From Swiss-Prot:
GO cellular component: extracellular region
Pfam family, one: Grp7_allergen
Record has Methyltransferase as a keyword: no
The protein, known as: Mite allergen Der p 7
Keyword tags: Allergen, Glycoprotein, Secreted, Signal
Coiled-coil stretches: none
Principal subcellular localisation of the protein: secreted
Chain positions carrying an annotated carbohydrate: N151
Compartments in which it is found: Secreted
Length: 215
């Protein structure tokens, strides 16, 4: 039934600005995305999500002091992805006869947390500790197209830049200058390596579920 509704609505939207048909196809796209998210959440592969170990070198400045160090992140697990939900309605438009939609999926009533073991070298310090990093604004941005046959195709999928990351580093107070250095380095790694890994794992899974139910 969804497929038939998509075919009819897509045909009208592609040639008409009738809000009734935009509302209908928006409703069907919302439903399809919700079903894809629900299917992903049922998989034990994604929560917790395992992220490859990561090693890095860093350099930071505190006043006139130049700090150089190394760190190793091990046993990285991401928890909380089962809380993902669609954020608002699909933004639907027609371009050259092709129906396109843009949506956001995110975790807003809870946090996505990364838990891992951290070993770092900073001057004479060579400790091993445990870290929990909370992402308080986890958002995925995605786009899709609906063909005249009612088939949905995922055209883009990306985990957005994290705007708010709170790090809890074992053995360090938030007032400790070393905490500030490590927190800055870790957050930069999340924005690059970890965010890319999340996109790499989630995108094909979402594409598979969305297109399997709407082909």
């Amino acid at each position: 039934m969804m497929k038939l509704l998509l075919i009819a609505a897509a045909a009208f939207v592609a040639v008409s600005a009738d809000p009734i048909h935009y509302d209908k196809i928006t409703e069907e796209i919302n439903k399809a995305v919700d079903e894809a998210v629900a299917a992903i959440e049922k998989s034990e592969t994604f929560d917790p999500m395992k992220v490859p170990d990561h090693s890095d070198k860093f350099e930071r400045h505190i006043g006139i002091i130049d700090l150089k160090g190394e760190l190793d992140m091990r046993n990285i697990q991401v928890r909380g992805l089962k809380q993902m939900k669609r954020v608002g309605d699909a933004n639907v438009k027609s371009e050259d006869g092709v129906v396109k939609a843009h949506l956001l999926v995110g975790v807003h009533d809870d946090v996505v947390s990364m838990e891992y073991d951290l070993a770092y070298k900073l001057g004479d310090l060579h400790p091993n500790t445990h870290v929990i990093s909370d992402i308080q604004d986890f958002v995925v941005e995605l786009s899709l197209e609906v063909s005249e046959e009612g088939n949905m195709t995922l055209t883009s999928f990306e985990v957005r830049q994290f705007a708010n990351v709170v790090n809890h580093i074992g053995g360090l107070s938030i007032l400790d200058p070393i905490f500030a250095v490590l927190s800055d380095v870790l957050t930069a790694i999340f924005q690059d390596t970890v965010r890319a890994e999340m996109t790499k794992v989630l995108a094909p899974a979402f594409k598979k579920e969305l297109e399997r139910n709407n082909q």
